[in-house]
A protein has these predicted regions:
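Short gly/ser/thr-rich secondary-structure transition/capping motifs
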Residues: 25-27, 46-52, 121-124
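Structural microenvironment flanking redox-active thiols in thiol-disulfide oxidoreductases
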Residues: 78-115, 125-131
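Thiol/disulfide oxidoreductase modules built on the thioredoxin-like
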Residues: 112-117, 124-178
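Short pre-active-site segment immediately N-terminal to redox-active cysteine/selenocysteine motifs
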Residues: 63-65, 69-73, 137
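Hydrophobic beta-strand anchors of alpha/beta hydrolase catalytic cores
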Residues: 66-67, 95, 141
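A short beta-strand-turn-helix
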Residues: 43-66
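Short secondary-structure boundary/capping segments
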Residues: 32, 37, 56-59, 133-134
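N-terminal targeting signals for export/organelle localization
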Residues: 1-46, 178
């Protein structure tokens, strides 16, 4: 009995190490959002940098749109930004931004330096809308269909590969639906 009592903490520790080691091998971007095929959570937020203007969830329905959650303090957001600029310039899709817990002056400087690909940017200063969306970190991008339903959630930055092989085919399919 004494020998087992001495080995029990070691066995528990090894079990926990194995459990967490397996978890580290999983790709968090493969986690499905509970919002898929459900309406985009309603929001009505001030437009970043534009006094008196509001950005609402209703603006994202009626056509297929992208909602990109980003922040000026987010390094991965800076990495994906050139791809978003390219999409906006080519008019591939209407792109809306959700500035997540950002400081207005830092956001303004970031957009001045890097360019603004967004049709409008909602200022989620408190992070409440991001919580409603289930955001776990920036950047995250949502494809919203004509009916205002979330059809896909991209966790992490959009690069050319993700655009060409995941997002663009889904958007083309959604735009073809009547």
């Amino acid at each position: 009995m004494n020998r087992f009592a001495l080995l029990l903490p070691l066995l528990l520790f090894l079990g926990l190490v194995a459990y967490f080691a397996v978890g580290l091998t999983r790709d968090p971007s493969l986690i499905q959002s509970v919002l898929i095929d459900k309406p985009l959570p309603a929001f009505d937020l001030p437009a970043a940098g534009v006094d008196g203007v509001r950005v609402t969830s209703a603006q994202l329905s009626g056509r297929v749109t992208l909602l990109n959650v980003f922040a000026s303090w987010c390094i991965a957001c800076k990495v994906e930004h050139p791809v978003l600029l390219k999409l906006a310039k080519a008019k591939k899709i209407e792109l809306y931004g959700l500035a997540w817990k950002d400081k207005p002056e830092e956001l303004k400087n970031w957009l001045s330096e890097l360019g603004n690909p967004y049709a409008a940017i909602a200022d989620d200063a408190t992070g409440r809308t991001a919580i409603d969306l289930g955001v776990t970190g920036a950047p995250e991008t949502y494809i919203i269909d004509r009916k205002g339903q979330v059809r896909y959630k991209q966790i992490g930055p959009i690069d050319d590969y993700v655009w060409e092989n995941t997002l663009q085919p889904l958007i083309a399919r959604l735009e073809a639906e009547q």
